[in-house]
């Protein structure tokens, strides 16, 4: 899906690194040490928490910046001299302090809709900071293949709320992703919900982030 969106927006894909594919099966299947990878302006990384950190470091070894949407790990784990961690609009950036070049853009969720949801969550949390009768909780539901729990998006929502928040994680079927933030009191309940209808929103957001990184 990322490939489809990138091509539709006029970008060239120089290669795909996927351990389930064998070099030679497809002209675009490459490895990190290939000339094609070294020519890339940016790499988009969506894998697992077990492989993401190493993938980022291998991309950096060739000077290629990365847009990373893999959750279950944190960019703070990347301790490289001259690189500085920043947070901008809910995303974590790693910037080379010597050149000023952004080498990593990481987000728990690149979906445009989810980032609007993040802003709604921050606003509601600010209002509720003056209403101690309400207790927050978060429920996140994803497909059975998702490894990390709670989801990175749920963790971001909890961090924005700023107080101790119970998070319920549900894994069922092929659910793309549903996040619900509930504020409950004896008098009433306030709920905000984001429901992903598929993976396209995540892919589009990642491509938009790659475009911004490469401007």
What function would you assign to each model-found segment?
Residues 1-37, 50, 132-215:
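C-terminal substrate-binding/catalytic lobe of Rossmann-fold NAD(P)-dependent oxidoreductases
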Residues 36-43, 61-64:
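Short acidic/histidine-rich motifs immediately flanking catalytic phosphotransfer sites
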Residues 53-60, 69-82, 90-106, 112-126:
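Rossmann-fold NAD(P)-binding glycine/threonine-rich loop
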